Amino acid sequence: MKVIILNGPMGVGKTTVGKYIADHHPGTAFIDGDWCLDIHPFVGNQETKAMAVDNILHMIGNYQKCSVCSMVVLVWLMDEPWVIQKITQGLSAMQAEVKNVTLVCSRENLIRRWKDDHNCEWRTDEWLNVSLKSLPGFASMENIIDTSDLSVEQVAELVMQ
């Protein structure tokens, strides 16, 4: 099974690109890591992130057993190296083919996308500041795609190469 991991700051387009890929590749499951850590109120600490990683790996393992599923797209903000390592180690144990991509964009693009997104409850000024501050960290990761001046289709094509 092929697993594509889309990482990056909030608002960069992980979900949009991930859903586009899933919609255009039959047999693809879409997982948003946020679903695996949906505690109210939100608590993003080591314990809850470890639980989310376990939930993600269980979901992918179940999709792997499903005859109609040939690929999984996982989107999640993974700003701590241990999270990515745990997921990739788990996928390696499943003998999955993994492609890990980090999406980034310019500060201006992130602000514009943030302001244009009226569907996400996280699109507050406070979270925008958190996301903007995280840009340099994501920009230093490997396998970067700068989505600033690209369409969803163009980003998806680059991810699938």
Could you describe each region identified by the protein language model?
Residues 116-158:
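Small-molecule kinase domains that catalyze NTP-dependent phosphoryl transfer to phosphate-bearing small molecules
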Residues 1-3:
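Pre-Walker A (Motif I) flank of P-loop NTPase domains
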Residues 14:
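Conserved lysine of the Walker
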Residues 94-114:
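Conserved phosphate-donor/acceptor-positioning beta-strand/loop module used by diverse small-molecule
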